Amino acid sequence: MIKNLQYFQPQEPKFGEITYKDIEEEGISAEEKSRRCWRFYLSKDDSIVTDLFLGQFRSTLRCTECQHESVTFEPFWIVSVPLAKDTIDIQECMELFVKAETLDEDEMPTCEACKQRRKCIKWYSFEKWPSVLIIHLKRFGPSASYRAKLTNKIQTPLRNLDLRYVELERDRVIWHGSPKWQKFQPKMPW
């Protein structure tokens, strides 16, 4: 059924068509990589549904040893946000989602620059917002013997969810702007 909603796409590759190899090209800026990833995804699935519901995450992984940053971009349809026991509004849930986490011990990735398994900091931010944002609340949390359902009530507006609050990475400056053009940044541990 989704195939029927897709815009007409010629079967032959077009001149200048983006490939996965182009996305992983070294030396391109994060913004250019974001644009290429977006075009690559839309070349595979471009429809009225993607126009309405598709957004893009920016995933950043920073090595704590050499400070090298690896940036990837991922499309999303739904944002699954965690709940804390004391969470009371959707804004807090979104802040938990973009909160930086430390990957160490068994979770340590291999740093692209060091070529060694290193402790890293990972966080998500929103690169592109969809026209219609779908938020899934993760209502089940870990418990000692079973997965407990979190039953706390979450306050959320029915219209016009305000995601303008942005905290810049290094400057720790609060910035108010339009969510269509600004990125929702994580609280960094430094």
What are these regions (language model features)?
Residues P13-I48, F53, T60, T64-W190:
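Exposed substrate/partner-binding surface patches
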Residues I2, G55-F57:
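Folded extracytoplasmic luminal domains of secretory or organellar precursors
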Residues M1-Q11, R62-E65:
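Active-site nucleophile-adjacent alpha helix/oxyanion-hole segment immediately C-terminal to the catalytic cysteine
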